Amino acid sequence: MKTFYLLFFFAVNFVSAQKTSEMSFNEYLGMVKKFHPLVKIADLEISQAQANLLMARGAFDPKLEANFNNKEFGDKKYFSVFNGGFKIPTWYGIEFKGGFESNEGSFLNPQNNTPTDGLNYAGISIPLLQGFLINQRMADLRKAKININLSVAERKLQAIHVLHQAAISYFNWKKNYEEFTLYDTYLKNAEIRLTGIKTLIEQGDKAAIDSVEANIIVKNRRLNKEDALLKLTKARLELSNFLWTNNAVPIELEETMYPEINLFKNIQDYLNTNELNLINFQTENHPKINAINYKINMFEVDRKLKANQLLPTVDVGYNYLSNPNQFQEFRFQDYKFGVNFAIPLFLRKERGSLKLTKQKIESEKFGLRFEKEQLMNKIESQKAEIQSLKKQEDLITDLVKDNSTLLISEERLFNMGESSLF
């Protein structure tokens, strides 16, 4: 089992070994942001999206190609065919190309005949309908760019989720630590009281039965402390789930560690809740809403591509031909021209694909409306909870004041020998 103690925990964070065993909330969140595996996985997804963008841009890379075929049999040279050149794809499906051909042989296909010195060509191919305004490589590049933004939004969403769970674990650790400290104080006070009762019994000022009552209180306090210790141990182990090193090695939190003492004073600065404005909150700025919008944008690119595929394929190509030593004379009467036309008669595949893409868009839009409504309701619920907690805090503060007054009064009565024992 790979576990590390407190000294290593601070060494990873470049903190001095002489530092106290208090772990501040800000330091803890910094560790989670940097080293938690789920946050690192989200970072890898951004890197993968960037790699996909690089691949999509590769579809527009110029290409060099060459093809050579030669056949000889029975002392006869049937044919020798060579074709080499380059292609430059552009944004709107237009391709520029150029190259050199040199073919010869006794059984050469007549359409492949070239001059003795070979044949240069330079040309262009243009898709007039399908593939002009949008084609597969254009769609892939657009989606890859959108996917970068989608990955960033999902990374932010994942990081927020991890930090939220980590903060809850820290607060739970803080609560259980304070509870354990409180019951430890209760136990010490009960033991002091038991010792005092026994002394009074020995002096004849108290009945022996009073020690039984005091001992029951001690045992109850000891039981409360043991239960609080169990809760604290569980909270500490839960907190350890969020502590990792840079090499993805888990860190076990030591028992000597304790949460930040002044957390209540600093928590608003750590979480920037002073600048939180829930009244004019816009759901469009939420990373989950942004992620869904990016998904819809990607499906919209697919929809445009599928709609374009309903058009006929009409590709026009033109090549300027010339001998190598006459290429700059621009004899435009020497050329090769072609037209390619194709269209499915029923377009069932294309229509079905377009319909499916439209349904995916509608599904995402329904999900978007649901998420917006759910998010707004959650915000309203949080606002109501915050207001209620503020009222409860005020009431508890008043209770503390009243109990403090009662304590002072009981201390006076105790000094006079009239206080009740409870």
Q: Which residues does each predicted region cover?
A:
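Bacterial Sec-dependent N-terminal signal peptides
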Residues: 1-22
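Bacterial Sec-pathway N-terminal export signals of envelope proteins
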Residues: 17-79, 129, 133-137, 143-145, ...
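Amphipathic alpha-helical coiled-coil segments
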Residues: 29, 41-42, 46-56, 158-184, ...
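Membrane-embedded alpha-helical bundles of multi-pass transporters/translocases
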Residues: 57-60, 87, 97-99, 117-123, ...
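Small/polar (Gly/Ser/Thr/Ala-rich) solvent-exposed segments
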Residues: 64-78, 93-115, 119, 123-157, ...
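Outer-membrane beta-barrel architecture
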Residues: 85, 123, 302-305, 340-342
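Periplasmic alpha-helical coiled-coil/stalk elements that build and connect Gram-negative outer-membrane
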Residues: 152-278, 385
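Metallo-beta-lactamase
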Residues: 228, 287, 364
